Amino acid sequence: MIPNSKGLVTPREYRCSPDLNLSSPQPAPSLVAVTAEEPRAPYDPMPHGPAEVGVGPWEGALPTGVEYDAQLLAEGDRRNVVDRYRYWSMEAIVADLDARRHDFHVAIENWQHDFNIGTIVRSANAFLAREVHIVGRKRWNRRGAMVTDRYQHVRHHEDVESLAAYLHGKGVTLMGIDNLPGSEHLETWAMPRSVCFLFGQEGPGLSEDARERCDGTFSIAQFGSTRSINAGVAAGIAMHTWIRQHADVPR
């Protein structure tokens, strides 16, 4: 692993932005284009791993709720969904998620086909982000998303200016994560309820345009020897911080 040396060292801690982590060469991933209304396949098998996951065909009298999918009831449900959504149609799952989505958004700059986008999208689904925004190139590495993007509202923006205009029109604060002078400390920051986290490319971090368009930036404290953390990891930390401050967490 080769970290980029972008982090800033302070006497007591490292405060960093997501940075570069390279591993051994991997096969070229398949890239897909994203649009504001990306079509969803009705059935989402896992992209890899054991075939026998999930549940088999429904046993006994069939349920009659409109949320159930006849093909899944007959053939079994092998999708990557929580148990409460077994045998539900994709449309029913999305509708149920839409009724209770959280008020944060996630945006990723995609100028170089960033490998972290899939991981960030998967975390956005787990924490129930309202929308995911891809800025720059439309095509992105879907592998890490584990088909969770099918249950998200994924929007594309040509540049950060259009992203900022869209968010500000909805009253959403745009916050970038980067190690910049004046950045808020995530650990002590009173996070807005309606906020979008913007993540830059691995290595260079936020683009100059993004830094100018953001309403502010925040950084994540580090205390070990590495100068950087992976962008996908940083995104998960930011989203979970929102959950801790604003979500209705079961006791």
Give the predicted meaning of each segment.
Residues I2-R251:
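Post-transcriptional modification and biogenesis factors for structured RNAs
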